[in-house]
UniProtKB/Swiss-Prot annotation:
One of its GO terms (molecular function) is deaminase activity. It comes from the Eukaryota. This is Protein mmf2, mitochondrial. Belongs to the RutC family.
Length: 126
């Protein structure tokens, strides 16, 4: 089994990991958040969701895939009360047919202390 690391030069990693790994015809994306130019971008849950999905789209682009090829999405929210507002942006940005999805109220995510409200990881087909 081969593992091919994927990293976009437009995004930065916040730790010792790859932004994605290609293996077995699938792309496994690490969690993305509302980060631009290496810095967290505070904002509403809608703004953070939009930027987070844009970051995932960039990683998928570099991997040779796209949001259209998503098969599974995991969303981590710091506050489940943000679910409906996050969902509005999610529905707007992701094409049908929608991927399988899990959304969890995680309480804290790595950027919580800076105001981070959401982290999204995904699996896509090549």
């Amino acid at each position: 089994m081969s593992k091919v690391p994927i990293n976009s030069s437009k995004l930065s990693c916040g730790g010792p990991y790859n932004q994605a790994v290609k293996s077995g015809g699938l792309i496994f994306c690490s969690g993305q958040a509302a980060v631009k130019d290496g810095n967290f971008v505070p904002g509403t849950i809608q703004e953070q969701t939009r930027l987070t999905i844009e970051n995932l789209a960039e990683v998928l682009r570099v991997a040779g895939s796209s949001l259209e090829k998503l098969v599974k999405v995991n969303i981590f929210l710091t506050d489940i009360d943000d679910f409906a507002a996050m969902n509005e942006v999610y529905k707007e940005m992701l094409p049908d047919p929608m991927p399988a999805r899990t959304t969890v109220a995680a309480g804290k995510i790595p950027l919580s202390s800076k105001g981070g409200k959401i982290e999204i990881e995904c699996i896509a087909a090549e």
